[in-house]
Amino acid sequence: MKFTEAQHITYLASLLDCKLSGDTHLFATGINEIHVVEQGDIAYVDHPKYYQKALDSAASIILIPEEVPIPAGKALLIHPQPFDAFNFLVHSFVSQLKLEDACVHESAVIYPNVYLGKNVQISEHCVIHAGAHIADHTLIESGVIIGPNSVIGFDAFYYKKKESGYDRMISCGGVHISANVEIGALCTIDRGVTGITRIGAGTKIDNQVHIGHDTQIGTNTLIAAGCGISGCVKIGNNVKIWGQVGMASGIEIRDNAIILGQSGVTKNVPEGAEYFGTPAGPV
């Protein structure tokens, strides 16, 4: 998520009532989950195992629970609960984003009982079938078909375990569906935590498929019914994923790969490979 205005790091430290360490002249231009951070962003980390990954990322400012050596040109916001601080900042700044009513092209067909959220754009010659729910910050390009009762852009399944239970990460991202995508009935595509979940042009998705937050799917890919794709997965172009496949978070399926039905994919799949089984391996 990008801020409407850059925020000086000393203001952020004051807002969070936390210690500031490192470059005190920085301005934050946004706040993002670690998988999608850019220069100028705030990211968070709360486990020593991932400190270095966060410090080496593109993020300029890191929310972290303790002081550690800081790379040049970066800063730390030292807070005992980085997850809570991250959620607080998202909540504080998402309210400043401009929200507009859905914009629907005159040639699009919208069936009864469709819900359209704020900052939704539906382009020419789209068809949105009855009962579909298109949540905030969803961009749908031309020629897209969305089946009955599908939900596009609901919140990410992202929680922090605490002694009292689970706290949800606030989702403020969106979904971008490129031209000529077809999505079947009863599908769910989660929006990004702070970034964008993307479906590439010409991709076809069967009924009852789930796609997790921040996943990136390329062009002309086929996904058959009953698949469950976790968050932050990268799927290339011209991939074929047959029925009831499950995919672990953060893996990559490269171009022209084929995943046979009922496979459980836990590791990256090379370009052009054909995988089957649980855990899936080369055929």
Predicted ranges, named:
Residues 44, 103-282:
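Structural signal for interior beta-strand "rungs" in well-ordered beta-sheet cores
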Residues 1-102, 106-107, 143, 149-150, ...:
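Terminal amphipathic alpha-helical/low-complexity segments used for targeting or macromolecular assembly
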